[in-house]
Amino acid sequence: MKKFFLSLCIAAAALMTACSQAPAEATAPKANNIETILKNLHDPKTNQVIVVCHRGDWRNYPENSIPAIESVIKMGADMVEIDIQLTKDSVLVLSHDRTINRCTTGKGNINEMTYEEIQQYYLKTAHGTRSSLDLKMPTLEEALAVCKDRITVNLDKGYDYYDLVLEITEKLGVTDQVLIKGSKPVAEVQAKMAEHKNNLLYMPVITPTNEKHKPLFEDYLAEKPQLAYEICFDEINPTVESAVKRVLESGSKLWVNTLWNSLCGGLSDDIAFETSAAEVYGKIVDMGTTIIQTDRP
């Protein structure tokens, strides 16, 4: 079985800390079941780090493809991040881009194409060549069926299609496994959720140094504790440190993206890979982070 790079690095960082305090035995990360993942996701007091895989295992398979999702499940990941777009005939498909140009062998705007038209083309790998697996762009329903009872899902752009997404998650029985996020006003999110009996999980995204986000942050902090906050920062400064402290003191979990430097103050996956992974990820964890989105599964 493939080993999960970030999980191993976090385990190593934890071991380094433990060794400085008391003798400890190193153990490799184990694959989680959905009950364990959800328990950790909803527990702000646990130190267990939830690992989120950005667009699945896109280094080995086409991004946002079923094999890319299956791969991170086999690795023992806790959550997979996938992106959605809406076709001309109102089918939610997995794609980060609004066009099919980069990720498939075809060209065109997704919102101007039917699902059947998109299915004429094949997914490309990260190298820009057609996948030898002859993969087609999957629907959200197909992807969530694969994830059911196996892994949680962060659905990028999920709020934009909230009602359609919820219809699918309720049909499949995976609503409690799906997390969406955004920088929407508190009142808007509350009004949307009041329309439904069951709701998707929601997480505010805050950039502490963004002046427009400061009142938004205060509004969310004034409410009951959020499941988590995604905090974005291009450097670690007093403003960021204060925001992190307030998130943790509020009883919420802290989510940090290590995808590229401007999201995590230079503590990115590539820096970790090229220098000291245990040290870089260790700094992220020492901040109080218990959810990390990575590009290095």
Language-model features: where?
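General helical structural elements
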Residues: 6-7, 59
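Phosphate-group recognition and catalysis centered on beta-loop-alpha active-site segments
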Residues: 19-297
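Positively charged n-region of N-terminal signal peptides that target proteins for export
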Residues: 1-4
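Bacterial N-terminal signal peptides
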Residues: 7-16
